[in-house]
From Swiss-Prot:
Gene name, Swiss-Prot/TrEMBL: rpsI
Cellular-component GO terms for this entry: cytosolic small ribosomal subunit
Record keywords, A-Z: Ribonucleoprotein, Ribosomal protein
Keyword Ribosomal protein: yes
Protein's UniProt name: Small ribosomal subunit protein uS9
GO MF term set: RNA binding; structural constituent of ribosome
Entry-linked InterPro entries: Ribosomal_Su5_D2-typ_SF, Ribosomal_uS9, Ribosomal_uS9_bac/plastid, Ribosomal_uS9_CS, Ribsml_uS5_D2-typ_fold_subgr
Protein family per UniProt: Belongs to the universal ribosomal protein uS9 family.
Length: 161
């Protein structure tokens, strides 16, 4: 695969040459920074990248709707917590990509990311989100296993004689 850079009178475009097939990628449009807010959230081993923009309340996680991605309704309610707290439900669209960890960690990472993005969007939300504990990163992670033991804290059975 060979990458060619082609200069035209239009903005710079990238052409990719793959086995005698030439495809041209158009440049991405510039996004107005005043209407879109970005934040990252973390929980356990999960990292969520969250983009928040003014909209109708649509939430997309890894190119799936929130109901398709999270099967449990309690997870969805937890993720919507920052919007309920700030009374902004159905006012923002959320697009996020999340990697690593399990479902619970990913839920926490998305929640943290949405809270941080809402904080950036309007400074008056900061006090509400801080009081609700949504801006603080939950630093609890799995304790490591120790040698000579079965698990992190479980020991082998002790025999007196």
């Amino acid at each position: 695969m060979t990458k060619l850079k082609i200069k035209t009178d239009k903005p710079l475009t990238t052409a990719v040459l793959t086995s005698k097939k030439l495809t041209v990628k158009a440049p991405r449009e510039k996004i107005d920074s005043a209407s879109k807010f970005y934040a990252t959230g973390k929980r356990k081993n999960a990292i969520a990248r969250v983009w928040l923009k003014v909209g109708k309340g649509k939430i997309v996680v890894n190119k799936k709707t929130i109901d398709q991605y999270f099967s449990s309704e309690t997870y969805v309610k937890t993720i919507l917590q920052p919007f309920v707290l700030t009374k902004t439900i159905d006012q923002y669209d959320v697009i996020c990509t999340v990697r690593g960890g399990g479902i619970s960690g990913q839920k926490g990472a998305i929640l943290h990311g949405i809270s941080k993005a809402l904080d950036k969007s309007a400074p008056d939300f900061h006090a509400m989100l801080r009081k609700g504990g949504l801006l603080t990163r939950d630093s609890r992670v799995v304790e490591r296993k120790k040698y000579g033991q079965r698990k992190a804290r479980k020991k082998t059975q002790f025999s007196k004689r």
